[in-house]
Every structure is written in C-alpha cells, then in structure tokens.
C-alpha cells in the first residue's frame, strides 16, 4: 500500500527524481517551434549609426532596397536606439511571406547601401539557430588555411598536337574517357569503376564531366579528371547545364529533407524538388517545388509527365524561365534569381515555350533583347496562337492565329534567324491529320511568316541545319500493319537563291518508302544522317551531302542545295547516333539501356565509311566531348577555308607519317620479342652448362645417346640422380618488315 502524504519520507519525495524519467519524446512532440511566425523576419546589419531624428529618414532610404525583393513597410521595420538616442547600426524587418525573407537574404546580403556601408542580411531564426549556447566558441580560433595548390587546366585537351577529340564511354559499371584515334584503337585517358550510378553528361563546352549519384552531382575536369565541384541533392535524377556552363539545374522526384547542420543545403531547400546552382561557388541560388508533383493527385486528374528541362535558359544566361502549364511563364534574372518585374507573365492555356538559342538583332530594333516563342491552344471560340515575346520588356512583337490545331512544336534555327512552328491540324471531322509549317523570319522587318502547306502527311521529325537555312523533315501517312514499322518519307528543303537573305523555302527532293525516324545533322552543317533507330527490323543509316560538288539536277538549280546520297550502312539494334564536334566522325551505338542484343558502337566517317566496329558487353553510353566556340574571327575562318586545300596536303602527309609510325611500331615490337627470346635461350644454355659441370656430365650430355652412355661417378656418397634434358628446336625464323 502506498504511503499517505503525511507519512512520506524525504527519500520518498526525491524517489521520482532519481528515476530520471525520459520526457524527450513528449518534448519533441509538443515543443513550440520558434520558426513558426518568425520566418518572415530578417536582421539587417551594417547600417549607418544615426540620431533619433534621422532614423525615419534612414528607414525610408532603406525601404528602397528592401522592396526590390519583396513587400514591407515603415511599420514593419524596427530600428532600436541606445541610451544616447542613437541607432545601433542594425534593424529588424518583417516581410509579408517567408519566401520574400529568403529572397532578401540571398539577394541583398553583401550589397552596398552607399559608398561606406554594406548590408549584411540574415534570417532572424538563423541567429537563434547558429548562435545558441554551445554553437560558438568563446575564444577565437583562427581558421585553418590550406596551402595553395595549383588547379589543373580545365581545357587542356584542346592542346592535343594532333587535334584529336575525346569521348566518354559508359559500359558495365565502368566509365572511361578516351582519345579518338580514327581506325586505330582508342587511347585511354582515364577508366574508373563505379564512377557514376545513373549516367554521365558533358557540360556544353566540354569543361566538366558530370557524374550522378544518390547523394548528388559531382563535376570532374582537368587532364586527370580530378574532382572540381560537388552539388549535394539527394536522389537526383535529372540535370541540365546552362549554355555558358555558369549554372546547373538538378531535379529529384523526392522532396529534399535537409538535415540540421548540412554544410550546403539549408531549411530553405527543405521540401523542394529543383535546385538552381552557381557552378563557380557551388552554392544553390534558389530552390523550387516541381509543378508536376505539387498538389494532391486524383483519379480524374492523373499525374502529368515531368517537364524537363524544368527551367530553360536564354542564350546569354541572363534569364531563365519555367512554365506553369496552362497558366503562366515565370522569368527570373540571373544571378540573383529574382522574378523579372516581380510578377509572372500570365498566359491563359500556355502549352510550351522556347528561347532563341542566339541573341537576335532584329531589323530596326536597337535595344538589347532576348526572344521567347510560346503557343496556346484553342480555348472556346478563341483560336490557337503562336507569339514572339521580347525580354526584358515582355512585349509581344509578333503573333499568329491558328485553327483546327491538335498539336504544335517550336523549332528555332541555331542562330535565331528563323523559328519554325510545326502545326498538326485535324480535319473538321477529326478523322485525318496533316501538318503545315509556319516559318517566322525573325531578323527581317516586321517578322514576316512563310507558310509551307504542301505537306500531305503528318510530320514526325523536323531538324534545322546548324548555322544554315535548310531543313529536313520526316512524314508518315496511315499506320502500317501490326508489327511492321510505319512507312515514312524523308523530305529535304532549301531556300531559293535570292541575294543575301534566304529566299522562299522549296522542296529539294522527297525519298519515299523509307522507315527512317531520326535526323542527325553534322554540327558544321552540310552533311546529315537520316536513320532508323529503336527499331526491331530496320537499322539503316543514310549519309547525305547537301552541297555535293557534282552535277546538279535541272529542277534543283535555283535552290541553295545539291543533294546526294553518299552511302547507306546498317548497324543492328542501333539506338543512338552521335556526331563528333568537328563534324568528321559519326558514332552509332546500340545501348543496353534499350535492349541486350549485340551492344556496342561503330565509328564512321562523315561520308559513311565504317572505320571500326566495337562490340562491347553492357554498353550504355557514348558521348563525344564538346568543344567551346572557336576564338577565330569570321575573317580568319574565311581565310582558313580559302587555304583548306593547302592544309589538307599537310594533313595527308601527317596521316601517312602516322601510318608509317604504326608500322614501325609493329616491327619494333617484333624485334623486341625476338631479342627477348634469344636472350632467354642464351641464359638457359648457360644454366644448362653449369649444371653439367656440377654433375660431371660431358658437353654432349644433352644428346639422348651421349646421356645414356655417360660414365657414372662412384666417388660421390649415396645415390646420384641424373636428369636428362632433351631440347629440340622445331623451327626458328626471323621476319623483318621494312
């Protein structure tokens, strides 16, 4: 029976304390989080120290900066005073939302207020989080400065004396980087097991090789491919570089869960799917929730396919934009990642958009601009619409209305001269489909639109010539029988010859009764491979020349093209085709990611000659290393083309010399092996002679008859074992290749 209160002893009173009951689970469950309600506050340090009568004036001046990243007011700024009625050099500011407070920290921290003062902006809760007891040492300890180590040259491969190109090869669990040696075996640069868990990807200028892991993305570079930068993003699945390699976008289907004390990620990234990184600093600029994963799913509205790239970059990296399908396009300014004009561009029904891949100077337009093209479907009685928008003004500079639209695809020419709008139209009964092309001539005054409506079937693939004004498309009519690949037609288009500007686009030739479904232009233009990929029955690669130097057909004389099929080759199970950055070589690959039959890659010349076949077990990925843009001016490039025949003679001599060196290497190897054999034979004979002397055998003891008749030495005590060695030289030859 428990004692009554009156009978409790001193020991009984403290008995419960001694048991030390653990309440940590209850504390964790009911603890009041200080972040709640305070995540909209920031602390601004580095302000001028002013008397009370100047405080309001300083606050108004400060608000000019504060309102560039969000919304706040004079009442939401608290600037404390000391006993002398002087400000303390800091202030507390409340924003309307936590997102605005985060933007203030990222965009205003370290910015100058005037010539003498620099703003230092921190979240109020960061001061509590990092400044609480035990987090900061009472005594100052100087930081440990590591000794200077010179970094590797990140573009060293461009200095190869033979101007060779590199490629990355992913097979099995190994990734290697190799030099291309034409028909000779590739030369290994580095080869590592478990270098990546998902895939590898070159940056657009070839500076970095990215490997993807469950922990994040790792960039490698330099002659030895050492570690350059790390971007922690748990369970990252997709990555995208900006055109100039300044920024990196990473995406994961799983929202990020940030652990306390993480060296890079903060609670601002918690729960996000997308991070935009600064490659130079290795720090996140801003993080976002994926539109496709936001909100609850229902049976009526199934989960949409992930839009990738989620962010699309302008040609000069000054802007990056993302689309909320059907509603708006949000354009952000770099490097601050603030929303342009503080608002998204509201576009009802917007389905897709694309930036111009180059900065365009339109006729009659002097101010700086980047161009963006988007389209909207038919909504009610309103027609579908394609529009060109100028950024940063957000002005619509050209629109085009479309009717009976099923789908639209936007295709920019690499220099931004044209944008082709591929419009799939249905008949009024919606039983048949056809395609026409609306080509915007962007650089011409008023942006005129040319319509190509001579196509009777649906276009399934379209591709502009790089740095040119020609294009290739593939059409298909009615579907073929079960199991049979659809019959397609390949059409080549070129402009008419009309002065400096490209004339109207005309059909050069159509190749019927094909199964082709993919188009791969040389990065230098002129040559194009039209292929059948991901097929179970057809594997043809057609190598075409658009500027054949032979005789021209009469009906093509007025067009800026002379079409010629150079060669057709087959590659069983082909899934991917990759041009090298110089346009000299083409690699066709059969990836194990698609099928397990005869995986490997073949190397071809631009004209279709197969230089090497490389069957490779568990082959997954082949990627040529990109090259940065040339540093030569247009005039210097023109001079190089003019003297190309002279250079080609030098190249032919170098190729011949390389072949001679290869033959010489073979001869030297054979001589070395022969000399090693002769030396070994001499050494063995010397050992044999020593053994004969040790056992008192005659010189002819190695002959069968002499060994049998040899006298026995009875002076030795015990038994003597004589080993008979029989050596026969079957054949000995010496071959020397000149």
UniProtKB/Swiss-Prot annotation:
<dbReference type="GO" id="GO:0003723">
    <property type="term" value="F:RNA binding"/>
</dbReference>
<dbReference type="Pfam" id="PF08662">
    <property type="entry name" value="eIF2A"/>
</dbReference>
<keyword id="KW-0853">WD repeat</keyword>
<dbReference type="InterPro" id="IPR011400">
    <property type="entry name" value="EIF3B"/>
</dbReference>
<dbReference type="InterPro" id="IPR013979">
    <property type="entry name" value="TIF_beta_prop-like"/>
</dbReference>
<keyword id="KW-0963">Cytoplasm</keyword>
<dbReference type="GO" id="GO:0071540">
    <property type="term" value="C:eukaryotic translation initiation factor 3 complex, eIF3e"/>
</dbReference>
<feature type="repeat" description="WD 2">
    <location>
        <begin position="232"/>
        <end position="289"/>
    </location>
</feature>
<keyword id="KW-0396">Initiation factor</keyword>
<keyword id="KW-0694">RNA-binding</keyword>
<feature type="region of interest" description="Disordered">
    <location>
        <begin position="1"/>
        <end position="20"/>
    </location>
</feature>
<dbReference type="GO" id="GO:0009847">
    <property type="term" value="P:spore germination"/>
</dbReference>
<dbReference type="GO" id="GO:0006413">
    <property type="term" value="P:translational initiation"/>
</dbReference>
<dbReference type="GO" id="GO:0005852">
    <property type="term" value="C:eukaryotic translation initiation factor 3 complex"/>
</dbReference>
<feature type="compositionally biased region" description="Basic and acidic residues">
    <location>
        <begin position="702"/>
        <end position="720"/>
    </location>
</feature>
<dbReference type="InterPro" id="IPR015943">
    <property type="entry name" value="WD40/YVTN_repeat-like_dom_sf"/>
</dbReference>
<keyword id="KW-0648">Protein biosynthesis</keyword>
<dbReference type="GO" id="GO:0010494">
    <property type="term" value="C:cytoplasmic stress granule"/>
</dbReference>
<feature type="repeat" description="WD 6">
    <location>
        <begin position="569"/>
        <end position="607"/>
    </location>
</feature>
<protein>
    <recommendedName>
        <fullName>Eukaryotic translation initiation factor 3 subunit B</fullName>
    </recommendedName>
</protein>
<feature type="region of interest" description="Disordered">
    <location>
        <begin position="693"/>
        <end position="720"/>
    </location>
</feature>
<dbReference type="GO" id="GO:0031369">
    <property type="term" value="F:translation initiation factor binding"/>
</dbReference>
<feature type="domain" description="RRM">
    <location>
        <begin position="40"/>
        <end position="126"/>
    </location>
</feature>
<dbReference type="GO" id="GO:0016282">
    <property type="term" value="C:eukaryotic 43S preinitiation complex"/>
</dbReference>
<comment type="subunit">
    <text>Component of the eukaryotic translation initiation factor 3 (eIF-3) complex.</text>
</comment>
<feature type="repeat" description="WD 5">
    <location>
        <begin position="511"/>
        <end position="554"/>
    </location>
</feature>
<dbReference type="InterPro" id="IPR034363">
    <property type="entry name" value="eIF3B_RRM"/>
</dbReference>
<dbReference type="GO" id="GO:0001732">
    <property type="term" value="P:formation of cytoplasmic translation initiation complex"/>
</dbReference>
<dbReference type="GO" id="GO:0033290">
    <property type="term" value="C:eukaryotic 48S preinitiation complex"/>
</dbReference>
<comment type="function">
    <text>RNA-binding component of the eukaryotic translation initiation factor 3 (eIF-3) complex, which is involved in protein synthesis of a specialized repertoire of mRNAs and, together with other initiation factors, stimulates binding of mRNA and methionyl-tRNAi to the 40S ribosome. The eIF-3 complex specifically targets and initiates translation of a subset of mRNAs involved in cell proliferation.</text>
</comment>
<dbReference type="InterPro" id="IPR000504">
    <property type="entry name" value="RRM_dom"/>
</dbReference>
<dbReference type="Pfam" id="PF00076">
    <property type="entry name" value="RRM_1"/>
</dbReference>
<feature type="repeat" description="WD 4">
    <location>
        <begin position="454"/>
        <end position="494"/>
    </location>
</feature>
<feature type="compositionally biased region" description="Polar residues">
    <location>
        <begin position="1"/>
        <end position="10"/>
    </location>
</feature>
<dbReference type="InterPro" id="IPR035979">
    <property type="entry name" value="RBD_domain_sf"/>
</dbReference>
<dbReference type="GO" id="GO:0071541">
    <property type="term" value="C:eukaryotic translation initiation factor 3 complex, eIF3m"/>
</dbReference>
<dbReference type="InterPro" id="IPR012677">
    <property type="entry name" value="Nucleotide-bd_a/b_plait_sf"/>
</dbReference>
<feature type="repeat" description="WD 3">
    <location>
        <begin position="301"/>
        <end position="342"/>
    </location>
</feature>
<dbReference type="GO" id="GO:0043614">
    <property type="term" value="C:multi-eIF complex"/>
</dbReference>
<feature type="repeat" description="WD 1">
    <location>
        <begin position="193"/>
        <end position="230"/>
    </location>
</feature>
<dbReference type="GO" id="GO:0042802">
    <property type="term" value="F:identical protein binding"/>
</dbReference>
<comment type="similarity">
    <text>Belongs to the eIF-3 subunit B family.</text>
</comment>
